[in-house]
Amino acid sequence: MGVRAQQKEKTRRSLVEAAFSQLSAERSFASLSLREVAREAVIAPTSFYRHFRDVDELGLTMVDESGLMLRQLMRQARQRIAKGGSVIRTSVSTFMEFIGNNPNAFRLLLRERSGTSAAFRAAVAREIQHFIAELADYLELENHMPRAFTEAQAEAMVTIVFSAGAEALDVGVEQRRQLEERLVLQLRMISKGAYYWYRREQEKTAIIPGNVKDE
């Protein structure tokens, strides 16, 4: 990469980081202006267009980066799990670590998931589906269950994790610790339930149809 290309990438990175830094519990991406972001990044507003078509393109880039950061962190967690340790507890700790270190990235995903922009909603939905798919792949490999079961389990887990993450953004250290313990329990219940249901379906296939009452 040449010097000019490196400088351009550095400026683009500065714009993304400047936009993230201006998000907060009280301020959403929709309230940011191009001039504010450019000023925070210490560039002229007109220079913004050398890097992004408009503010929405900047926001979509931020959504993609937020999802990628989270997925990369969870991959690292799975690598740590392979060396020993509780799958669920390690994953929950890693997720809470992500929220603690990148609160605005998670806020962006939460808000734009149900925001007014169809493009942003689609981008967040895509990132969540990537997250679910990677978790389903892992569960399928580790638990040796059919894809339909691991996808359902992964979707349930991600839904609960994102809900807990939303709570974690606005609580103190002790409350977050309690929230983490509750989340570990909930995920273990889902995991046990998924395995029980899978075994139950296996047993049903070994019984003559009509002899089993569906629940």
From Swiss-Prot:
Keyword Isomerase carried by entry: no
Residues in the signal sequence: none
Molecular function GO labels: DNA binding; DNA-binding transcription factor activity
GO BP term (any one): fatty acid biosynthetic process
Annotated HTH tetR-type domain residues: 10-70
Superkingdom, taxonomy of origin: Bacteria
Keywords: Cytoplasm, DNA-binding, Fatty acid biosynthesis, Fatty acid metabolism, Lipid biosynthesis, Lipid metabolism, Repressor, Transcription, Transcription regulation
Entries under InterPro entries matching the protein: DesT_TetR_C, Homeodomain-like_sf, HTH_TetR, HTH_transcr_repressor_FabR, Tscrpt_reg_HTH_FabR
GO cellular component, one term: cytoplasm
Main location group: cytoplasm
Pfam families, per the entry: TetR_C_46 (PF21943), TetR_N (PF00440)
Cell compartments where the protein resides: Cytoplasm
Reported function: Represses the transcription of fabB, involved in unsaturated fatty acid (UFA) biosynthesis. By controlling UFA production, FabR directly influences the physical properties of the membrane bilayer.
Description of how the protein assembles with itself and partners: Homodimer.
The protein's name: HTH-type transcriptional repressor FabR
Lineage per the UniProt record: Bacteria, Pseudomonadati, Pseudomonadota, Gammaproteobacteria, Enterobacterales
